[in-house]
Curated annotation (Swiss-Prot):
UniProt similarity note: In the C-terminal section; belongs to the phosphoglycerate mutase family.
Protein name, per record: 6-phosphofructo-2-kinase/fructose-2,6-bisphosphatase 2
Regulation of activity: Phosphorylation results in the activation of the kinase activity.
Originating species: Pongo abelii
Active site feature: D128, C158, H257, E326
Length: 530
């Protein structure tokens, strides 16, 4: 077989071994396996209704939970085709030349959507444009049907003049369409552009013409919602997310607990209390918050002692969230990195190879942690001013969401002790301020290793998180892998039960870390232990 060497084929010609699929396996989060076909999200709405805001925010969320998503903004394509914007006349429905250009831009954008979803491993594409006519939406539906894409429409409806004016002044004044123009001229031209679109605008009709489509109408920035014919899991998650976000001004403060006794010793995990300097930080944090004069501030902590002790010093009510607890290091809890490297050298190497996907034996991975923290993100999106006192890995995951960081960067984000991250949501992202309180603390950050393996050396086999792929371009059936501590429940033969009680037998080759090098990860068919 292709997975065996020539010597193995000669000595064991009767034996077939599964090919090594791990080196070519695409890194993908759990959520990607919940999409059974690519989805095209189509934005609808007049200009200045927050479509781009929703597109970017939704894309950031979907990428964070592990669904590869990309925005295709039609304005970018239009500015490539027409280098200089002159006035609202370009958007008149009776400007035939401009209409041809706009349609051609849409077709080019859809071709890029097709390439992303079919050739670049994308799962969801967001088509950010007005799409206000039925003709344009029918064209998109035909395109999706030809390529077997699901379609979900998101229509933003707003008739509040104050909201529209604020959106124009906050976002459109800085648009590439208006270089070096004053606010009054921008407002006048853009309002006329909106009037051009109103002439041909046909909102989605849930009672007749569009009753069979899947969509959500977001009315007046989330005051009301209308949801129609949600098709699948991903669409339901999109609806749930859009029903939780808001645009009211607020500030989110993220910080770690004060320095703990285990921090001083270099140990990970555990439930130790604050050190002397950690208690000093808690007092400094209280003084900082009093100076900020924040109204209606909510304080959240984990259920571990070090975050609770930090919050206790603030003298304000706080809520404890178990899902804010630090990443579970399993068998490595309360150990230093030097101890882990000495006792479990292969585990130490595995984590350095792929920190986001690596799961501690009996513990969690960063990927697991993102799944665990999703309810926190939903609640943060619903809230006003919040202070979250958490832990290094937890804070990295939360920061990655707000700063739109990918799986490669997430585990290495710097979140030092005794430092506050002040996050202020803005039009298309998040403004970040780093505030260091004047209290010394140990450095718990580990830089990303180089991982420069020699060309003739195969990296240590990666133990992946448990999943069952729903589909694969590879025709060879992959073995189902289970993480340590998560093996399937099934009756054990007396011999197997005895093996488990007495430890590894002579048939089971051992690694330096004590794990079987053949069946690690467990349940591989080629392992003689099975």
């Amino acid at each position: 077989m292709s997975g065996a060497s020539s010597s193995e084929q000669n000595n064991n010609s009767y034996e077939t071994k599964p090919p090594n699929l791990r080196m070519s396996e695409k890194k993908c989060s759990w959520a990607s396996y919940m999409t059974n076909s690519p989805t095209l999200i189509v934005m609808i709405g007049l200009p200045a209704r927050g479509k781009t805001y929703v597109s970017k925010k939704l894309t950031r969320y979907l990428n964070w939970i592990g669904v590869p998503t990309k925005v295709f903004n039609l304005g970018v394509y239009r500015r490539e085709a027409v280098k200089s914007y002159k006035s609202y006349d370009f958007f008149r429905h009776d400007n035939e030349e401009a209409m041809k250009i706009r349609k051609q831009c849409a077709l080019v954008a859809l071709e890029d959507v097709k390439a992303y979803l079919t050739e670049e491993n994308g799962q969801i594409a967001v088509f950010d444009a007005t799409n206000t006519t039925r003709e344009r939406r029918d064209m998109i539906l035909n395109f999706a049907e030809q390529n077997s894409f699901k379609v979900f429409f998101v229509e933003s409806v707003c008739d509040d003049p104050d909201v529209i004016a604020a959106n124009i002044l906050e976002v459109k004044v800085s648009s590439p369409d208006y270089p070096e123009r004053n606010r009054e001229n921008v407002m006048e031209d853009f309002l006329k552009r909106i009037e051009c679109y109103k002439v041909t605008y046909r909102p989605l009709d849930p009672d007749n013409y569009d009753k069979d489509l899947s969509f959500i109408k977001v009315i007046n920035v989330g005051q009301r919602f209308l949801v129609n014919r949600v098709q699948d899991y991903i669409q339901s998650k999109i609806v749930y997310y859009l029903m939780n976000i808001h645009v009211q001004p607020r500030t989110i403060y993220l910080c770690r607990h004060g320095e703990s006794e285990f921090s001083l010793l270099g140990k990970i995990g555990g439930d130790s209390g604050l050190s002397v300097r950690g208690k000093q930080f808690a007092q400094a944090l209280r003084k900082f918050l009093e100076e900020q004069e924040i109204t209606d501030l909510k304080v959240w902590t984990s259920q571990l002692k070090r975050t609770i002790q930090t919050a206790e010093s603030l003298g304000v009510p706080y809520e404890q969230w178990k899902i804010l607890n630090e990443i579970d290091a399993g068998v490595c809890e309360e150990m230093t990195y030097a101890e882990i490297e000495k006792r479990y050298p292969e585990e130490f190497a595995l984590r350095d190879q792929e920190k986001y996907l690596y799961r501690y034996p009996g513990g969690e991975s960063y990927q697991d942690l993102v799944q665990r923290l999703e309810p926190v993100i939903m609640e943060l999106e619903r809230q006003g001013n919040v202070l979250v006192i958490s832990h290094q890995a937890v804070m990295r995951c939360l920061l990655a969401y707000f700063l739109d960081k990918g799986a490669d960067e997430l585990p290495y984000l710097r979140c030092p002790l005794h430092t506050i991250f002040k996050l202020t949501p803005v039009a298309y992202g998040c403004k970040v301020e780093t505030i260091k309180l004047n209290v010394e603390a140990v450095n718990t950050h580990r830089d990303k290793p180089t991982n420069n393996f020699p060309k003739n050396q195969t990296p240590v086999r990666m133990r992946r998180n448990s999943f069952t792929p729903l589909s694969s371009s590879n025709t060879i059936r992959r073995p189902r892998n289970y993480s340590v501590g998560s093996r399937p429940l099934k009756p054990l033969s007396p011999l197997r039960a005895q093996d488990m009680q007495e430890g590894p037998t002579s048939r089971r080759p051992k690694s330096h870390s004590g794990w079987c090098t053949v069946c690690f990860p467990p349940a591989l068919a080629s392992c003689p232990c099975h």
